[in-house]
Design a protein with these regions (language model features):
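Acidic (Asp/Glu)-rich catalytic clusters
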Residues: 64-70, 104-105, 154-160, 238-248, ...
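N-terminal carbohydrate-binding accessory modules
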Residues: 1-71
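Surface-exposed, active-site-proximal loop segments in enzymatic domains
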Residues: 80-95, 120-140, 175-182, 189-192, ...
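Short, solvent-exposed loop/turn elements at domain surfaces
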Residues: 15-21, 258-259, 300-301, 408
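Extracellular glycoside hydrolase catalytic/binding regions
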Residues: 161, 172-382
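Aromatic-rich peripheral "rim/lid" segments of glycoside hydrolase catalytic domains that contact
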Residues: 336-437
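Hydrophobic faces of well-ordered beta-strands that scaffold small-molecule active sites
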Residues: 5-11, 74-76, 110-114, 163-165, ...
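An active-site-proximal structural segment forming one wall of the substrate-binding cleft
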Residues: 47-74, 84, 88-116, 126-167, ...
Length: 437
């Protein structure tokens, strides 16, 4: 696997929940994250929803489809409580067991990604508790996470399907912490007391210990993956001196996130962003292979497309047809005696004109929809192509995410989510080519 470029997709929102990816799961509550969903839902209802969701969100058919697209890896985010040894959290490790069976059946590798920690490592909803980031300040919880990693390594270390284990997802830097929209937004202010960014010194120490413990239970042909902590260029010396074998540095690169801070949402800006990222990646790869573990083609340039060439055209067609009808009616009524016998023809003409209007507007709407879809497809493919060219300089890439919002049709207000959904991107021709395999 190490000699082969990684081409993968994340199985997000399966074992680690994110409200924006499937709001239906959070219905009836105002919870922003999984922790508060668990606190607010009655226990029986929570159990029912979680079971229904986990049984259906990812199935064997999904992994078969993924393999059929020519991908070779799935990254599976898992929560810190997946072994179910802390009440009231239930085990979900059996679903990870299933994923390994399916992955091995279809020739896929699995990257296990420890996505959350007790107390959160970034303050995001994907860390399980919005606005709280204090895991790293509690030595007992740090030790607990290390034991979770050890158990994962012992359980799956010799599985054919294991690519590796990522020890921690997105531990947050000072800069990102202080610019994140979730910082300071904890529902329980007391619970967030002591929150702050994850210092680089702590992270290096934690990574070294995590590597040591994983290597005690996991062979060297299985990779250990470290997230860059939003500090991509800070790791050169660390990996040169560490004496580590078969390790990767994971970086997450989102144009969508970059756009939040810039007023220009155009391809030339994307090229500048990607060019800078590629320059940094090439520099870091002299010390360690770099993996783009999360990215997507969602951009404001494509998601919020409006084509002004077609605006108003439907009104023009409708107005023209109604004007013709009105002029004909006026001419008949102006000389009613002479045209008394034409009343039947007038009614027929009126019906034909109205039918013509309906057909013309339907045709216009169909053509406009097709034109907008093609324009949007071109824009998404342009972004996909420039990103994929950039990732060619890396050890590989993993798309975020496989699916969003189940199979339901997204509302107009949710249409921006399509670019995060790999299945829909493939089926709409925005990236790759769908296979029948």
């Amino acid at each position: 696997m190490t000699a082969e470029k990684i081409r993968g997709v994340n199985l997000g929102n399966w074992l680690v929940l994110e409200r924006w990816m499937e709001p239906e799961l959070f219905r009836g509550t105002d919870a922003e994250d999984e922790t508060w969903l668990r606190r607010l839902l009655p226990a029986k209802e929570l159990e029912r929803r979680l079971k229904e969701h986990r049984e259906s969100w990812i199935t064997e058919a999904d992994l078969k489809w993924i393999a059929g697209q020519g991908l070779n890896l799935v990254r599976i985010p898992v929560p810190w409580f997946l072994f179910g040894d802390r009440a009231p959290y239930e085990s979900c490790v059996e679903y990870l067991d299933r994923a390994f069976l399916w992955a091995e059946r279809y020739g896929l590798k699995v990257l296990i990604d420890l996505h959350t920690t007790p107390g959160n490592q970034n303050g995001y909803d994907n860390g399980g508790l919005v606005g709280v980031c204090r895991w790293h300040r509690d030595p007992e919880e740090v030790e607990y996470v290390l034991t979770v990693l050890t158990r994962l390594g012992a359980r799956y270390g010799n599985r054919e399907g294991l690519f590796g284990i990522e020890v921690l997802n997105e531990p947050i830097s000072w800069l990102v912490y202080h610019s994140a929209p979730t910082t300071g937004r904890a529902r329980d202010r007391e619970e967030s007391r002591g929150s702050g960014h994850v210092p680089l010194k702590f992270l290096r120490t934690f990574y070294l210990e995590a590597y040591r413990r994983l290597r005690e239970v996991m062979p060297e042909d299985k990779a250990v993956v470290f997230h860059d902590g939003f500090r991509l260029t800070a790791w050169n010396a660390f990996f040169r001196r560490g004496g580590m074998k078969n390790v990767y540095l994971d970086t997450h690169q989102y144009i969508w996130a970059m756009e939040m801070f810039l007023p220009f949402h155009k391809p030339f800006v994307y090229r500048l962003f990607l060019g800078h990222a590629e320059k940094q990646i090439r520099k870091v790869q002299k010390a360690v292979p770099v993996l783009v573990g999360e990215w997507c083609i969602c951009t404001r340039h494509a998601s919020f497309l409006r084509n002004h060439r077609y605006e108003g055209k439907g009104t023009d067609i409708l107005g023209t047809r109604l004007k013709e009808l009105s002029e004909f009616t006026d001419s008949v009524m102006a000389d009613a005696d002479r045209h008394r016998g034409l009343v039947g023809k007038l009614e027929q003409k009126e019906a034909e004109a109205l039918q013509s209007v309906e057909q013309s507007v339907e045709q216009f709407l169909r053509e406009r929809k097709e034109a907008l879809q093609e324009k949007q497809r071109e824009r998404y493919r342009e972004v996909a192509d420039m990103e994929l060219r950039t990732w060619e300089s890396t050890a590989g890439w993993i798309y975020w995410s496989y699916k969003l919002c189940g199979n339901r049709r997204l509302t107009a207000g949710e249409s921006w989510k399509y670019g995060w959904d790999f299945r829909r991107c493939v089926r709409r021709g925005w990236i790759g080519e769908e296979s029948n395999g």
